[in-house]
Regions:
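N-terminal active-site beta-alpha-beta segment that forms phosphate/nucleotide-binding
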Residues: 1-66
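Conserved phosphate- and dinucleotide-binding cores of soluble alpha/beta proteins
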Residues: 39-172
């Protein structure tokens, strides 16, 4: 088998990897979105690859923190947001595993995690406040890339695509 799959991060994915190891002979290996998932995959006997080593990722499998009725997601609560986005964007298909507890009418009950370069945390936080958000620095936590996480409450997420664009335009 030549298929490479992408694997996300978090408690749901940990359960998935535990089941996936039974089928490890049906695919070549996986690209992971975090060091923790890479370790779990390797411990399960599943070959892992760096994204730069593969030409194609067939499926990206991950969980979500919230899912709206319109299938918009809040992801990144596990702190691997940047790599999750990168690996997911490289895949042909995205498979999101959630249970009914993650389904919401309106996104925003779960804080929106935003990964920031450490030097820009204060600037990004001020911009978020100007948008109506309440940023909370996730103290003592660094991503695998050495970045920090700001968990944001109180943002209007009625237009998730526009909000994502606004947030992505904040330097840092």
């Amino acid at each position: 088998p030549e298929t490479i799959i992408g694997i996300g991060t978090g408690s749901t994915v940990n359960f998935f990897i535990d089941e996936l190891k039974k089928y490890k002979n049906l695919f070549k290996g996986a690209v992971s979105s975090s060091n923790a998932s890479t370790k779990l995959l390797n411990d399960s006997g599943i070959q892992t690859y760096n994204l730069n080593e593969v030409l194609e990722i067939e499926f990206y499998i991950d969980g979500a923190d919230e899912v709206s009725k319109d299938n918009y997601l809040i992801k990144g609560g596990g702190g691997a947001h940047t790599r999750e986005k990168i690996v997911a964007s490289a895949a042909n298909y995205f498979i999101c595993i959630v249970d009914s507890s993650k389904l919401v009418n309106q996104l925003g009950a779960f804080p929106l995690p935003i990964e920031v370069i450490p030097e820009s945390r204060s600037l990004v936080s001020r911009k978020i406040v100007s948008m109506g958000g309440i940023p909370l620095y996730r103290s003592g936590f660094l991503t695998d890339q050495g970045n920090e996480i700001i968990d944001v409450k109180n943002l209007d997420i009625s237009d998730p695509m526009n909000l994502e664009m606004e947030l992505n335009n904040i330097p840092g």
